[in-house]
Amino acid sequence: RLTSFSHGGGCGCKVDPAELKVLLQQVPAHASHPKNMLVGVEHGDDAAVYQINSEQALVFTNDFQTPLVDDPYIFGCAAAANALSDVYAMGGTPIMATAIAGFPVNEVKPDRLQQIMLGGTDICNRAGVPLAGGHTIDNPQPIYGLAVIGMVHPTKIKTNAASRVGDKVIITKPLGIGLLASAFRIDQLQDHHYQTFVESITDVNSAGSWLGDIAEVHALTDITGFGLAGHLVEMAEGARVRIQINADKVPLYAAAEQLARDGVFPGGAYRNMEAYDGRLSFGQDWNIDRQLIFTDPQTNGGLLITLAPEAVDSVLERLHDHGCPEAVSYTHLRAHETLTPISYAVFCLKSGGGGGG
């Protein structure tokens, strides 16, 4: 099994956000921030952006992961889709990619390695992105991903730090991928739920490229290793707002709620909860299993969009017509100005109820 080579799969293998923050604090930023560097390390965004002229900016990212499935082709597809998503999450369009790969070459058969690479190539072809080479090493754990270059107009960049008071939120996919992945690893995921799982992790978030053209879309990111809660905190902190969300309206994959009750969470869900402790607030009497659903790490999760209320209906309609049938908006969500560095993301069961902080 490919998953037997790794201690965590997909975006669940990411370094915990608290440890990452400490690590990066010890690494100085570029001594002279180039004026053309429009997006760098400031807010932990999905990609870097460098302006090359008045009409064009380059979007650059790299993303790789360990297996969260045993099928090598599906692993390659999921890793590639997840990497491309970072460019889409900036409002950009990918134009080229190169592969990043590492395998225990003496333990994994060559045909399985070829299937991983074929999966990545097929996803790039589906997205119209040439895969122009890469770099491969002998490594104890299988890893695969992409370095991706995209393009965006400098005035249409979408960051994770531009939400405004009064914005609404749209999420384009249900939650629960980390739970489904954990259930798969212990042979507790039924076949029909596995098929849903595969469809989600290989679905390309290409809607981000046209969301960049909509001025009323203020902030954009993809929901990945830090879970919905973590990415909401990052988004709220960057804009200095507080986001409140009605948690019982958040869509979940069919098996996720029962798996949560059974405690089938990946380690990343617990690490995320600890890392964002103090910046999250949940409704009264919530048990830990309910809370962990929102810190569950997603692999190639949906887009997280904040936008002006008047644009919600038209954006939702377009999402539903263009491959995001489960996209949902939170008209009961509010962003409130705050001067305190706590409870940036508030989850409650009724609009205005629970939560606090």
Whereabouts are the PLM-identified features?
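Hydrophobic alpha-helical segments, chiefly the membrane-spanning helices
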Residues: 343-357
